[in-house]
């Protein structure tokens, strides 16, 4: 970094002369060091898949949950700083329950994601705080049908047919842009998602224990069991 940019590097609320917020950019770099995760829509639902890398043989594998239940028909997968992700997941759960109690209907996923994004955006413009070092993919079913959004450290949100976050994002997105098509069955979507994750691996790496979850129209959140996952590897 050039000497003249150092002052802007330390201040979260000050733009550099070329319009950059360096702390937000650094938060995005933290996401790039996280596990790869993806989401994609299929014919009557939406799917989340995450690579779950086990860093130590001493860790209980079942204790590492990358895909999180928000509501019966909404889930999220995260990549980046785990503690930051936990705070935002709890925020999303509370927001979803408040809406459900107030309106008594399916949670509007776009509104939910906007509330989480607003929370993240606030941490890019006030002194004494830092941006959340995490990105999230939200997937679920609402009144419109299957929905899929992502949200980054700046609080930017987009809706997708298929998307990815984490260290292998570029490779996964490149693969999906070539191979994804609308109208896939759930089985076809899982097969495609696993292939996309494998395309992001370094030479010599193996996809050993991915997490897979789906939500379909009329059916609640479902996490795939270990034996189900093995069939797709």
UniProtKB/Swiss-Prot annotation:
Belongs to the peptidase T1A family. This is Proteasome subunit alpha. The lineage of its organism: Archaea, Methanobacteriati, Thermoplasmatota, Thermoplasmata, Thermoplasmatales. PANTHER family: PROTEASOME SUBUNIT ALPHA/BETA. Keywords: Cytoplasm, Proteasome. Transmembrane segments: none annotated. GO terms for cellular component: cytoplasm; proteasome core complex, alpha-subunit complex. InterPro entries: Ntn_hydrolases_N, Proteasome_alpha, Proteasome_alpha-type, Proteasome_asu_arc, Proteasome_asu_N, Proteasome_sua/b. Its main location: cytoplasm. Pfam families: Proteasome, Proteasome_A_N. It comes from Thermoplasma volcanium (strain ATCC 51530 / DSM 4299 / JCM 9571 / NBRC 15438 / GSS1). GO terms for biological process: proteasomal protein catabolic process; ubiquitin-dependent protein catabolic process. The 20S proteasome core is composed of 14 alpha and 14 beta subunits that assemble into four stacked heptameric rings, resulting in a barrel-shaped structure. The two inner rings, each composed of seven catalytic beta subunits, are sandwiched by two outer rings, each composed of seven alpha subunits. The catalytic chamber with the active sites is on the inside of the barrel. Has a gated structure, the ends of the cylinder being occluded by the N-termini of the alpha-subunits. Is capped at one or both ends by the proteasome regulatory ATPase, PAN. It comes from the Archaea. The formation of the proteasomal ATPase PAN-20S proteasome complex, via the docking of the C-termini of PAN into the intersubunit pockets in the alpha-rings, triggers opening of the gate for substrate entry. Interconversion between the open-gate and close-gate conformations leads to a dynamic regulation of the 20S proteasome proteolysis activity.
């Amino acid at each position: 970094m050039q000497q003249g940019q150092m002052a802007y590097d330390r201040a979260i609320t000050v733009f550099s002369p070329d319009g950059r917020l360096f702390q937000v950019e650094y938060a995005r770099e933290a996401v790039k060091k996280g596990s790869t995760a993806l989401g994609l829509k299929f014919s009557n639902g939406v799917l989340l898949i995450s690579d779950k890398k086990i860093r130590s043989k001493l860790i209980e594998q079942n204790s590492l949950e990358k895909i999180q239940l928000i509501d019966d028909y909404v889930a999220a997968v995260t990549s980046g700083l785990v503690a930051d992700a936990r705070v935002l997941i709890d925020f999303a759960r509370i927001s979803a329950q408040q809406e459900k109690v107030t309106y008594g209907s399916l949670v509007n996923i776009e509104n939910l994601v906007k509330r989480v994004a607003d929370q993240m955006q606030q941490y890019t413009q006030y002194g004494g705080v830092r941006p959340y070092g995490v990105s999230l993919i939200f997937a679920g079913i609402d009144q419109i049908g299957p929905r899929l959004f992502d949200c980054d450290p700046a609080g930017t949100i987009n809706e997708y047919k298929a998307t990815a976050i984490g260290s292998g994002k570029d490779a996964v997105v490149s693969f999906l842009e070539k191979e994804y098509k609308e109208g896939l069955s759930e089985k076809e979507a899982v097969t495609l998602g696993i292939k996309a994750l494998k395309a992001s691996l370094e030479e010599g790496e193996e996809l050993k224990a991915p997490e897979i979850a789906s939500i379909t129209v009329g059916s609640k959140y479902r996490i795939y069991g270990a034996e189900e996952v093995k069939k797709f590897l």
